[in-house]
Amino acid sequence: IGENPKGDQEEGSSDGSIEILGQDIRQFKDWSSISYVPQNGMGGWKDFPASVEEIVRANLYKQIGLFRFAGKKERQQVRAALAQVGMEEYQNRLIGRLSGGQQQRVLLARALVNEPKLLILDEPTSALDEKNASHFYRLLKKINAEKRITVLMVTHDLKRASSYADDIWVLEDGKVKQEAGKGDGQA
């Protein structure tokens, strides 16, 4: 149940279906196979006292156990995720000492450390300059190709997205207004 743009209560659609990784969402149980990168997720954490390594490792607490120390396997997973995004040499630096682009790459590493099948990103480049935004998109395309991770991103930057995405859906008022794919030359 939620509110529509007019402020009226709605229960949602009763027709159609939603599948995640080929499974009906109502029966889906493998939530650890999905990772999320928020919009400008580290904004305002300038004095947050955690290192890059600690931020990434936090996504492994389900695997490690709360209040337990990471073992060799988990430390290797963290290093591998940081290497994927080009941030391995920053692992001991405090997260608040990094640029916005570097922080977003750390959040991407945090999402990748679990080796997800689906990566969901919410406007991940909204706070980045042109150079860092382009680098971030190239990085996502590389990860998608090399790791075979499905990437689902919300963005208002259709021009840039169309250069990297295989498929694009334009939503308006909660409905698909336009759909385009690489095969039809419109993405």
What would you call each of these model-derived segments?
Residues 13-30:
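Conserved ABC transporter NBD signature motif
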Residues 57, 71-90:
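Conserved ABC ATPase "signature" region
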Residues 94-98:
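Conserved ABC ATPase signature
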Residues 115:
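Conserved catalytic motifs of ABC-family nucleotide-binding domains
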Residues 119-122:
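Catalytic Walker B motif of ABC-type/P-loop ATPase nucleotide-binding domains
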Residues 155-156:
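H-loop/switch region of ABC-family ATPase nucleotide-binding domains
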Residues 168-181:
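H-loop (His-switch) and adjacent beta-strand-loop-beta switch element
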